[in-house]
Amino acid sequence: MSERRVAMDLPSGSNASMPLQRHRVSSLRGTRSPSSLDSPPASRTSAVGSLVRAPGVYVGVAPSGGIGGLGARVTRRALGISSVFLQGLRSSGLATAPAPGPERNHATAEDLGGCLVEYMTKVHALEQVSQELETQLRAHLESKAKRSGGWDALRASWASSYQQVGEAVLENARLMLQMETIQAGADDFKERYENEQPFRKAAEEEVSSLYKVIDEANLTKTDLEHQIESLKEELGSLSRSYEEDVKVLYKQLAGSELEQTDVPMGTGLDDVLETIRVQWERDVEKNRAEAGAVLQAKQQTEVVHVSQTQEEKLAAALSVELHDTSRQVQSLQAETESLRALKRGLENTLHDAKHWHDMELQNLGAVVGRLEAELAEIHSETEQQQQERAHLLACKGQLQKDVASYHALLDREESN
């Protein structure tokens, strides 16, 4: 009996490949309808005996309700019958006295029907006991809750505590967000400060170089002022010497007189004319010498005046050049400051652009990482589904092989 399989032919509308064990619980939970399994042994024997077929061992159509409606070829494992139960069945008088041929199969079917009826009776009794215990337990819990005065006060305190905890969690999250924002701002300012340090050093170096240029310009200015003072002193000394020379010349011209001749004049006309000619030539030579001296003094005066004019022009040109140089230095300083401001603005713009670019790259990287994680998860799910499908196909093939082997075994038994 342990080596034999018992098959049942149920209505064609039911699934022929579904095991009975899978739907046993659902069928037992429903309301049982009257069936031949709940009927007396005599009627059950007649119902089973009317549906027996030869030469195989088959159990006919079961009534609706109970285990009816589940058409399947079942084994003792599918029926949930333990080996102990079957051992007890084998130890009974019905199993020890098998009848040959159809009578043996009929007796085996009757024994199996009786075992199933007893099993169903025990199951329904256990279900009723379980329902009664559940009802008693529920009533006990309700009475205990009523005696304790209800859960409204505790529920209200629990709700208030839950609300306070939720508010505290939200406040903590808000504070954490503020701290993260402040920390991010501090890190940003620190990074900007560190980035501005090289530019600050470069600006300080430029300012120090400009201070050196200004010091050199001040030294040049002082030197030029000293040169102008020395030129003014030299010009004053030249003008004083010129005035003294002019005064000496004026005195010389004012104190000069005609020289008297000591030569006696003759009495004749020729002697008188000769004397006048000699005196005239002498006066002409004297006047020529005086005119030459005057012209030479005038030329010297003009040279001194010209040199004085050139020195004044040189001093004026130097002062104008100094003024232009200072003005150019001031304009260069203003232009340098404007260029520094422009440079700082461009550097800040570049830094902001780099910062936003890095933020965009980080956001895109996070999105790409999330998409890659989702893609990997989808791949893993797909592989898992493929493995499950392969496993199900393998199980299907194995079940088909088992069914074929069962059919072959039953056919061999029928042929025997």
Swiss-Prot record:
Q: Which GO terms describe its molecular function?
A: structural constituent of eye lens
Residue ranges annotated for the IF rod domain, each copy included: 105-416
The N-acetylserine modification is found at S2
Q: Where is this region: Disordered?
A: 1-48
Q: How does it sit in the membrane?
A: Peripheral membrane protein
Residues recorded with modification Phosphoserine: S27, S33, S36, S91
Please give an example of a GO cellular component term from this record: cytoplasm
Know the name of this protein? Answer: Phakinin
